[in-house]
């Protein structure tokens, strides 16, 4: 059976469920999670999405991104997917949310109400090869420069929220996970 996603309205209120592919074919707004894990040197753990992913395969992205299951809280989904994709178990804190919509060359449309979580971890990940085929630690300043220079090598959502990630890290101290800021930004492409 196909994975289900939680359909939401513009305020993140649940309005139903849909198959993951159907939601992406229709461009239906659905709930998502994005996780950013930092080490003690304030470097971000990036993953390269597995080539076989249904979209954005082979692109560098944030540590982990996925969708909550029906009736699963976003924070619980974030912890679960971080373990499943990257083999990392760490405390996660909600940082912010944002909404974005973009169309891929394949015709799929990503339209997500994305809940962003921050965590801290110094160990090496254990990659699930179905999800990610490489990883690296990267300095945020270097990442910002590279995303602007070579945007085609990064996932849309990473590039879309990177400035907000940096802002939240600055507001809350580089060594600590961000506290919930409670605001939502909207980005369309």
Curated annotation (Swiss-Prot):
GO terms for biological process: dimethylallyl diphosphate biosynthetic process; isopentenyl diphosphate biosynthetic process. One of its GO terms (molecular function) is isopentenyl-diphosphate delta-isomerase activity. Mg(2+) binds at residues 65, 85. The active site is at residues 65, 112. GO terms for cellular component: cytoplasm. Keywords: Cytoplasm, Isomerase, Isoprene biosynthesis, Magnesium, Manganese, Metal-binding, Plasmid. Mn(2+) binds at residues 24, 30, 67, 110, 112. PROSITE patterns: NUDIX. It catalyses: isopentenyl diphosphate = dimethylallyl diphosphate. Residues 28-160 form the Nudix hydrolase domain. Its cofactor is Mg(2+); Mn(2+). The keyword Lipid metabolism does not apply. It is found in: Cytoplasm. Its EC number is 5.3.3.2. The keyword Heme does not apply. Pathway: Isoprenoid biosynthesis; dimethylallyl diphosphate biosynthesis; dimethylallyl diphosphate from isopentenyl diphosphate: step 1/1. It is an enzyme of class 5 (isomerase). Binds 1 Mg(2+) ion per subunit. The magnesium ion binds only when substrate is bound. Belongs to the IPP isomerase type 1 family. Catalyzes the 1,3-allylic rearrangement of the homoallylic substrate isopentenyl (IPP) to its highly electrophilic allylic isomer, dimethylallyl diphosphate (DMAPP). HAMAP family: Idi. This is Isopentenyl-diphosphate Delta-isomerase 2. The lineage of its organism: Bacteria, Pseudomonadati, Pseudomonadota, Betaproteobacteria, Rhodocyclales. The gene is idi2.
């Amino acid at each position: 059976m196909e994975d289900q996603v939680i359909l939401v309205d513009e305020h993140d209120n649940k309005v139903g469920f849909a198959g993951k592919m159907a939601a992406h074919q229709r461009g239906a707004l659905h709930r998502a999670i994005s996780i950013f894990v930092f080490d003690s040197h304030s470097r971000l753990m990036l993953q390269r999405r597995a080539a076989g992913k249904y979209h954005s395969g082979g692109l560098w992205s944030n540590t982990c991104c996925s969708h909550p299951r029906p009736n699963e809280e976003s924070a619980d989904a974030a912890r679960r997917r971080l373990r499943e994709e990257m083999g990392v178990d760490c405390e996660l804190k909600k940082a912010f949310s944002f909404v974005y919509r973009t169309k891929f060359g394949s015709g799929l449309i990503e339209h997500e109400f994305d809940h962003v979580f921050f965590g801290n971890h110094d160990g090496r990940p254990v990659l699930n090869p179905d999800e990610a085929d490489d990883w690296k630690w990267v300095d945020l300043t270097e990442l910002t420069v590279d995303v602007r220079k070579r945007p085609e090598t990064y996932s849309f959502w990473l590039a879309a929220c990177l400035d907000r990630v940096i802002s939240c890290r600055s507001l809350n101290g580089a060594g600590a996970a961000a506290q919930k800021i409670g605001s939502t930004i909207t980005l369309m492409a």
